[in-house]
Amino acid sequence: MPVEEALERLLALADAAPITATEKVALAAAEGRVLACDLVAGLDLPPWPNSAMDGYALRLADWQGEPLAVSQRIFAGHAPQPLQSGTCARIFTGAPLPEGADCVEMQENAQVMDDGRVHFLEPLALGQNVRPKGQETRVGELVIGAGTRLGPIQLGLAATLGFAELEVVRRPRVAVLSTGDELVEPGLPLGPGQIYNSNRRLLVSWLQRLGCEVVDAGILPDDLARTRQCLGGLGDVDLILSTGGVSVGEADYLGLALREAGELALWKLAIKPGKPLTFGHYQGVPVIGLPGNPASTLVTFGLLTRPYLLRRQGVAKVEPLRFSVPAGFDWPKAGTRREYLRARIEDGQVHIYKNQSSGVLRSAAWADGVVEVLEGTTPQQGDVVTFIPFSELLG
């Protein structure tokens, strides 16, 4: 299955099961959350005309080339008096323009005379260096649309408009579980044939960065009854996310439980790493099963699960930005699957890690993104390739 088809299917499933519950949170708690309703301006920005420069405010008609006396000083945060006819006002950046003034001359183009009057050295124009009322935003204008993920810029804009809290989509509740007798949690001694459970830490941290509420379901027991019990306790989550794969073998208790109390589809994705992917439901709860090799987990979560979770919160644009970068490597073997090579940019070119095995998480720690190599292509050094930064996938 092409990755585009898998994504299309997952997004359709997400659209059919949106998270509709919302809550109000303070701006300080809204980072990474999804706005639940349109944010509409309740005031003009700026609320009044103000100065864009440190300088002098005046009425253009009062200036005939002669120096003007300074009648007041206006600082940001202070209300000015109406401008006296035939005078100017010392004004500072962001301060309200006094009634009657219609332009500001920057202080660099003004000369203060011995008697305190100000001589303007350059021609003046109506409205120069003045920020008009409502220049940025007018009352009633849509400022941030529903379905927007809130970052520092959006939160700063909301604060500028006076919002102390925002209506956001409830956090997705995601249960993370691992499968595999070989897995041991870090800190415990390893037995023969065992490895530490790195995927759990990878996914829990990633989900938290995405604003999810994570339920750590641990490692599934090697027992069907206990697997049923574990899954049955996850009925209040929005997604069950497993790693380790689901097979058709008799010892695959997760697969058996899904088949008897839900539905299960095994997708063979035409990507590398990350060929096997599972989607199903257990007693109505969506289940996504990611491949167990760490690099495969990273790629399939970033390209498929992350968009699915964002779409369920109402985010429309869920795919990562892609950038065209010159290749600093040769990839001579054309594959039948789309490949995602762990890579990083150095000196204006993208270079790949020496070992692209799906079991090598160190390749991703070294990298700052992945190169997307299309099926049947053999990019050579200097060719333009597509690069997806981890910054587009992890946040």
Task: Label every model-predicted segment.
Residues 1-164, 324:
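Phosphate-interaction motifs
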Residues 4-7, 20-28, 32, 37, ...:
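Flexible glycine/proline-rich
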Residues 49-51, 60-63, 80-84, 97-99, ...:
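Solvent-exposed alpha-helices and their adjacent loops that cap or buttress functional pockets
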Residues 59, 90-92, 121, 145, ...:
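Short beta-strand segments
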Residues 63, 94-95, 181-182, 245-251, ...:
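Short glycine-rich anion-binding loops that position phosphate/pyrophosphate groups of nucleotides
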Residues 129-242:
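Phosphate-binding glycine-rich loops and their immediate beta-loop-alpha structural context
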Residues 249-260:
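Short Gly/Thr/Asp-enriched flexible loops that form oxyanion-binding sites at enzyme active sites
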